[in-house]
């Protein structure tokens, strides 16, 4: 198999990407990354033909478009910064558009009772932790299907699990730390169903490095016949993220049940769904500014827009802050200290950039002086010019002085009295350019705190440049 000549690929790079303040060495590395990524995951046939240098055509461009469409990126056929960012993420080694084909059609196990064997163990974890991680991964799939799984200690099992490194004689060598973490084969005889984990990775049972339970649950989905999902919230999404609780999204459940049917449980499990930025029914749990940007939070996810990138960025909260819980209920930025404070229940966390500050979480009672009757905060914002922070709880609000570190006297007050027209409850709020933006359900109210008037009423997701709401 031949490679595209490096000079031609660099010419391709110069034509299809915008100017980067990067060294020639960096560009060469990125060109090599693009070629290898598309060959491995998008079946790019590297036959040595010249890449078109002046038109958006040719095999590399078409495969780039295919990859960008799969990951929900802006489809340009150009190796832009967002595309390279995705390519550099650790991920599963199974291709996105061509499975490890062993049999024609849609492979599945004919029997519902399957066996598995762990052939060897990683030294990164105690054996009991490895056993537990793999067992829990199988349970995720058995909970939603008629499938059952039994661990055996010797002989040939339906699904053989091993920790290997480099070239391990399956025509899909591992690449060292990072990059390709693991892979598994679709159901079938011999190597079919087997799962291999790269021993050059550091496997853990927490959010650090690579969580074995999380990766195993994904790979076993392949062992059962699933391919990759384009849903970023699905366990079968190809890139690795750890979002705290490892669970099947509804997309995963729908996929596996399409192959094996529903479980025999009287109550059918339901998985979380990934929010869609332009869903007219979209609501938010919390919103805050952070260093000039606005971040929107929903369940396990954050959403944000970037003036340099028109697409809405959607990802797990844990990508930025792995120590924060999912389902945040309120957030606000205190710019004077470059802090953002996140609330859930009666606890809150303070972060600077991507770092959760030492000593958190703390409780809202000793820190802010809330009465014990307050069980959680619905929404919060802080006025940068006054140091006053507003906390909205049910139909009332408190005002806190950040500099005196105490509640202002005379509070709580009624929301409806001091913020006429926005209703009795606030789901989320933030301040930008001197205006308060209140959110309740699918509605957003732009409020002028000086005149105490609502200026505009829009859909909650109006910040996302959706064509239709």
Swiss-Prot record:
Its main location: secreted. Residues 98-276 are annotated as: Metalloprotease. Zn(2+) 1 binds at residues 168, 170, 183, 196. The modification Phosphotyrosine is found at residue 360. Ca(2+) 3 binds at residues 175-176, 178, 180, 198, 201. SUPFAM superfamilies: Hemopexin-like domain, Metalloproteases ('zincins'), catalytic domain, PGBD-like. Coiled coil: none annotated. Undergoes autolytic cleavage to two major forms (22 kDa and 27 kDa). A minor form (25 kDa) is the glycosylated form of the 22 kDa form. The 27 kDa form has no activity while the 22/25 kDa form can act as activator for collagenase. Ca(2+) 4 binds at residues 285, 329, 378, 427. It catalyses: Cleavage of the triple helix of collagen at about three-quarters of the length of the molecule from the N-terminus, at 775-Gly-|-Ile-776 in the alpha1(I) chain. Cleaves synthetic substrates and alpha-macroglobulins at bonds where P1' is a hydrophobic residue. The active site is at residue 219. Residues 1-19 form the signal peptide. Ca(2+) 2 binds at residues 158, 190, 192, 194. Keywords: Autocatalytic cleavage, Calcium, Collagen degradation, Disulfide bond, Extracellular matrix, Glycoprotein, Host-virus interaction, Hydrolase, Metal-binding, Metalloprotease, Phosphoprotein, Protease, Repeat, Secreted, Signal, Zinc, Zymogen. The keyword Metal-binding applies. Glycans are attached at residue 120. Cleaves collagens of types I, II, and III at one site in the helical domain. Also cleaves collagens of types VII and X. In case of HIV infection, interacts and cleaves the secreted viral Tat protein, leading to a decrease in neuronal Tat's mediated neurotoxicity. Belongs to the peptidase M10A family. There are two distinct domains in this protein; the catalytic N-terminal, and the C-terminal which is involved in substrate specificity and in binding TIMP (tissue inhibitor of metalloproteinases). The conserved cysteine present in the cysteine-switch motif binds the catalytic zinc ion, thus inhibiting the enzyme. The dissociation of the cysteine from the zinc ion upon the activation-peptide release activates the enzyme. This is Interstitial collagenase. The lineage of its organism: Eukaryota, Metazoa, Chordata, Craniata, Vertebrata.
């Amino acid at each position: 198999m031949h490679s595209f000549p490096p000079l031609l690929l660099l010419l391709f790079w110069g034509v299809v990407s915008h100017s980067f303040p990067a060294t020639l060495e960096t560009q060469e590395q990125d060109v090599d990354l693009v070629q290898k990524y598309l060959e491995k995951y998008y079946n790019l046939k590297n036959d040595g033909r010249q890449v078109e240098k002046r038109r958006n055509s040719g095999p590399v461009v078409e495969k780039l478009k295919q990859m960008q469409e799969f990951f929900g990126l802006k489809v340009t056929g150009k190796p832009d910064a967002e595309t390279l960012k995705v390519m550099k993420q650790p991920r599963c080694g199974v291709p996105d558009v061509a499975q490890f084909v062993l049999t024609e059609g849609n492979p599945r196990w004919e029997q519902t009772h399957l066996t598995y064997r762990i052939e060897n163990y990683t030294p990164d974890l105690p054996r009991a932790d490895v056993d537990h991680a793999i067992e829990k991964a199988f349970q995720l799939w058995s909970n939603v299907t008629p499938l059952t799984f039994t661990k055996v200690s010797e002989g040939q099992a339906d699904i053989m699990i091993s920790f290997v490194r480099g070239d391990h004689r399956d025509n899909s060598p591992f690449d060292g730390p990072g990059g390709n973490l693991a892979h598994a084969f679709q159901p079938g005889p011999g190597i079919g169903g087997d799962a291999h984990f790269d021993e050059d990775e550091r496997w853990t049972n927490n959010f650090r490095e690579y969580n074995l339970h999380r990766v195993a649950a994904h790979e076993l989905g392949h062992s059962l016949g699933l391919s990759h999902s384009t849903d970023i919230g699905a366990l079968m999404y190809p890139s690795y993220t750890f979002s705290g609780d490892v669970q099947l999204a509804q997309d995963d459940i729908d996929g596996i049940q399409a192959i094996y049917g529903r479980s025999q449980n009287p109550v059918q499990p339901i998985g979380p769904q990934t929010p869609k930025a332009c869903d007219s029914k979209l609501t938010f749990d919390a919103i805050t500014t952070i260093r000039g940007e606005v971040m929107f939070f929903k369940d396990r996810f954050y959403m944000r827009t970037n003036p340099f990138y028109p697409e809405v960025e959607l990802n797990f909260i844990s990508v930025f802050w792995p120590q924060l819980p999912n389902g945040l209920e309120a957030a606000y930025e205190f710019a004077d200290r470059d802090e953002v404070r996140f609330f859930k229940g009666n606890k809150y966390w303070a972060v600077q950039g991507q770092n959760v500050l030492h000593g958190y979480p703390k409780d809202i009672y000793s820190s802010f002086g809330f009465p014990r009757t307050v069980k959680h905060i619905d929404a919060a914002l802080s006025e940068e010019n006054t140091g006053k922070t507003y906390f909205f709880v049910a139909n009332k609000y408190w005002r806190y002085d950040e500099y005196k570190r105490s509640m202002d006297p005379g509070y709580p007050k009624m929301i409806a009295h001091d913020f006429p027209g926005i209703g009795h409850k606030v789901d989320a709020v933030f301040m930008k350019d001197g205006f308060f933006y209140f959110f309740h359900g699918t509605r957003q109210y732009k409020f002028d705190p000086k005149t105490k008037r609502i200026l505009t009423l829009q859909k909650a997701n109006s910040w996302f440049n959706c064509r239709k709401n």
